Curated annotation (Swiss-Prot):
Naturally occurring in which organism (per UniProt): Cytophaga hutchinsonii (strain ATCC 33406 / DSM 1761 / CIP 103989 / NBRC 15051 / NCIMB 9469 / D465)
Family according to the record: Belongs to the EF-Ts family.
Gene for this chain: tsf
Protein name: Elongation factor Ts
Claim: Protein transport is one of the keywords in the record: no
Cross-referenced Gene3D superfamilies: 1.10.286.20, DNA helicase RuvA subunit, C-terminal domain, Elongation factor Ts, dimerisation domain
Function according to Swiss-Prot or TrEMBL: Associates with the EF-Tu.GDP complex and induces the exchange of GDP to GTP. It remains bound to the aminoacyl-tRNA.EF-Tu.GTP complex up to the GTP hydrolysis stage on the ribosome.
InterPro entries, sorted: EF-Ts_dimer_sf (IPR036402), Transl_elong_EFTs/EF1B (IPR001816), Transl_elong_EFTs/EF1B_dimer (IPR014039), Transl_elong_Ts_CS (IPR018101), UBA-like_sf (IPR009060)
A Pfam cross-reference name: EF_TS
Length: 278
């Protein structure tokens, strides 16, 4: 069995807010698997976010450009290893050039984007390789998303490392950017794992039910009641972790779905993406 280090224990504590000894026991039980350790903590009743703490070491720039008609948005995340590199001119210029060619050529995938030529004829990937050699850090496109909708609304957090795009539908031709920005900021802050209940990964649903049962069992609830209790906890998970069902942070008497419908009858979200470099 591998030895669990103090750094790993502290990392899990930072991710979950659980006590040091609880984190050590969970990591030991899981063999050092952080995702499994989080599930162990939750089964034992620890108040750990089901959405999972972000656990990346990337720095870089997340940029978004929306078309003039507001019906398409493109997000590009260009990552490096350290914050100082993300602020140098060569890195910023490459990020801007990649976005410009994405807007002009409309690639469907990251692979297609990487193969596109920039102004000097060399491809995006060749420029990335050159910059990696020049600065001594790995540079990579970690995310590229092209999103269509009746109205696409962007949000970039002030640190430039977190971006959200929201596609609205049933706008009725109305400018709904104000409501869309509220939704995008909600997604940035509350980290939903899916748009609505039906969009949650079935494996996640199964895991939440199992965790709910274990929590109820640990509380001494009768076996015959475990399924019902677990389904109740699952409904709370949906409320906490799916965007349309989350409480609106600006007015918790409403869900996001209700806020949108109040802004314009029938207004809703057809898609969203949240990308963070941290």
């Amino acid at each position: 069995m591998s030895t669990i280090t103090a750094a790993e224990v502290n990392k899990l504590r930072t991710m979950t807010g659980a006590g040091m000894m609880d984190c050590k026991k969970a990591l030991t039980e899981s063999g050092g698997d952080f995702e499994a350790a989080i599930d162990i903590l939750r089964k034992k009743g620890q108040k750990v976010s089901a959405a999972r703490a972000e656990n990346t070491t990337s720095e870089g720039i997340v940029s978004i450009t929306v078309s003039a008609d507001g019906k398409n948005g493109k997000l590009v995340a260009l990552a490096c290893e350290t914050e100082p590199v993300s602020k140098v001119a060569d890195f910023k210029n490459l990020s801007e050039a990649i976005m410009a060619v994405a807007v002009a050529k409309k690639p469907a995938t990251t692979e297609e984007l990487s193969a596109l030529p920039l102004a000097d004829g060399r491809t995006v990937q060749e420029h990335i390789i050159d910059l990696t050699g020049k600065i001594g850090e790995k540079v990579t496109i970690t995310s590229y998303v092209s999103m269509d909708g009746e109205q696409v609304v962007p949000y970039i957090h002030s640190n430039g490392k977190l971006g959200v795009m929201v596609a609205l539908k049933n706008t009725g031709g109305k400018d709904c950017s104000e409501a869309g920005r509220d939704v995008a900021m909600q997604a940035a802050a509350m980290k939903p794992v899916a748009l609505d209940k039906d969009d949650v990964d079935p494996k996640t649903v199964e895991r939440e039910i199992e965790i709910g049962k274990e929590q109820a069992r640990a509380e001494g609830k009768p076996e015959a009641m475990l399924e019902k209790i677990a389904l109740g906890k699952l409904n709370k998970f949906y409320k906490d972790a799916t965007l349309l069902n989350q409480e609106f942070v600006k007015d918790n008497s409403k869900s996001i779905s209700q806020m949108l419908d109040g802004f314009h009858k029938g207004l809703t979200v057809s898609a969203f993406v949240r990308i963070s470099l941290s």
